[in-house]
């Protein structure tokens, strides 16, 4: 049975519509049509604004995801990573809101009555080109790392050559001859290389490689927006950038400067992290038999005891200890033993626990420990 309900709400008029004798029928139809067209145009305008807002939100989400990935590759700071993750979460929330509004707009459009302007539409008004389907599942972290390692081992020399280019024509020609370089692995390698150069204080070279890094990232972003393989669209990037489009060029330069600042920040964090690790290793090497750092123990000693270590005078140290409060003297000397600043003799090691020294009896009779790096033991 045919369902005729679809024709229940059709906003059309014909010559048999009854009108008042004093009203010009043609003018009435013309006014109705004009009002209907204006409503349709307003609706279309609102729909386009929603669509534009949704696309812009998706672009921001993609940009935030790119920065997050770049930060993870560069082993950036935790605070910056948390900030970007929070921003990405907020953007995804906004994206869902835009999509919901668009869906409501589509439902509203379907429920609108048909009219003479919408009863028929073009059947074919454009050509369709097959594109590579988007990946539904991302590779695991281990797979990505192995893929990156294999790619770098095979093409590291070519990637570095591309990183040293500067002219647009040279870069385009080199990528045309080596299209396998147009990929995410190349961009990741260039990012890490930039940070390494900044750590080595090769600032001018870092800025050169940073330029090529942004070139590759712009190509990848263009491919993502067009939903095609980057190797199929890198020439479009060079065509666009070489036409001296002011707005596009300003966007490129702004992103380049922002990227260089991020590289400097990552390099600074890496240096600070390396220094902390080095200091911790050196501290562990210095630890005495009781697990204390001799440098820290030395700095915590009273000034009169520090002077004894400075001049490496055992008798002077014993005299200073004998003049101190027995409890304080025992505390400081035990810390010196635990840190390795002092090595007690056999007599001292056999002393009963808790025994206090008298005014003329030093707490410990010690011998100097040789080979201390800080030269604070005697």
UniProtKB/Swiss-Prot annotation:
Q: Disordered: where is this region?
A: 123-145, 347-378
Where on the chain is N-acetylvaline found, per UniProt?
A: 2
Q: What is its main location?
A: cytoplasm
Alphabetical list of InterPro entries matching this protein: Cdc37 (IPR004918), Cdc37_C (IPR013873), Cdc37_Hsp90-bd (IPR013874), Cdc37_Hsp90-bd_sf (IPR038189), Cdc37_N_dom (IPR013855)
Q: Which residues are reported to carry the modification Phosphoserine?
A: 13, 120, 377
Chaperone as a keyword of this entry, yes or no, is yes
Q: Which GO terms describe its molecular function?
A: heat shock protein binding; Hsp90 protein binding; kinase binding; protein kinase binding; protein kinase regulator activity; protein-folding chaperone binding; scaffold protein binding; unfolded protein binding
**Which residues, renumbered to this chain, carry the PTM Phosphothreonine?**
118
- Kindly list the places in or outside the cell where this protein is found, as annotated in its UniProt entry: Cytoplasm
> What post-translational changes are documented for it?
Constitutively sumoylated by UBE2I.
What highest taxon heads this organism's lineage?
Answer: Eukaryota
- Coiled coil (residue ranges): none
Annotated Pfam families: CDC37_C, CDC37_M, CDC37_N
Biological processes, Gene Ontology terms? positive regulation of type 2 mitophagy; post-transcriptional regulation of gene expression; protein folding; protein stabilization; protein targeting; regulation of cyclin-dependent protein serine/threonine kinase activity; regulation of type I interferon-mediated signaling pathway; regulation of type II interferon-mediated signaling pathway
Role of this protein: Co-chaperone that binds to numerous kinases and promotes their interaction with the Hsp90 complex, resulting in stabilization and promotion of their activity. Inhibits HSP90AA1 ATPase activity.
Q: Which family does it belong to?
A: Belongs to the CDC37 family.
Protein's name in the database:
Hsp90 co-chaperone Cdc37
Native organism is Homo sapiens (Human)
Encoding gene, per UniProt annotation: CDC37
């Amino acid at each position: 049975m045919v369902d005729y309900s679809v024709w229940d709400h059709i906003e059309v008029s014909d010559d048999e519509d009854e009108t008042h004798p004093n009203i010009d029928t043609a003018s009435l139809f013309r006014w109705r049509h004009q009002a209907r067209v204006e409503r349709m145009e307003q609706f279309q305008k609102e729909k386009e604004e929603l669509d534009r807002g949704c696309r812009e939100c998706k672009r921001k989400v993609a940009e935030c995801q790119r920065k997050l990935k770049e930060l993870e590759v560069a082993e950036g700071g935790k605070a910056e990573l948390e900030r970007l993750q929070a921003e990405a979460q907020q953007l995804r929330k906004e994206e869902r809101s835009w999509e919901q509004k668009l869906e409501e707009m589509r439902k509203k459009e379907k429920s609108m009555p048909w009219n003479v302007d919408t009863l028929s539409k073009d059947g074919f008004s454009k050509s369709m080109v097959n594109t590579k389907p988007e990946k539904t599942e991302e590779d695991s972290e281990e797979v990505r790392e192995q893929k990156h390692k294999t790619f770098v081992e095979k093409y590291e020399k070519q990637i570095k050559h591309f990183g040293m280019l500067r002219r647009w024509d040279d870069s385009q020609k080199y990528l045309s001859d080596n299209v396998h370089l147009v990929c995410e692995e190349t961009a990741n390698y260039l990012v890490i290389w930039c940070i390494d150069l900044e750590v080595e204080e090769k600032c001018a070279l870092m800025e050169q490689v940073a330029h090529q890094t942004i070139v590759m990232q712009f190509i990848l972003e263009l491919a993502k927006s067009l939903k095609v393989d980057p190797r199929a669209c890198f020439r479009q990037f060079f065509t666009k950038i070489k036409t001296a489009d002011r707005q596009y060029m300003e966007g490129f330069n702004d992103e380049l400067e922002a990227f260089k600042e991020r590289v400097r920040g990552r390099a600074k964090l890496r240096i600070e992290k390396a220094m902390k690790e080095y200091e911790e290793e050196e501290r562990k090497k210095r630890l005495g038999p009781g697990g204390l750092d001799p440098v820290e123990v030395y700095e915590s000693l009273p000034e009169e005891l520090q002077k004894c270590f400075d001049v490496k005078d055992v008798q002077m140290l014993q005299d200073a200890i004998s003049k101190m409060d027995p409890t304080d003297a025992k505390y400081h000397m035990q810390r010196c033993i635990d840190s390795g600043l002092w090595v007690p003799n056999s007599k001292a090691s056999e002393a009963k626990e808790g025994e206090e020294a008298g005014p003329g009896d030093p707490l410990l009779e010690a011998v100097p420990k040789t080979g201390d790096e800080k030269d604070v033991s005697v």
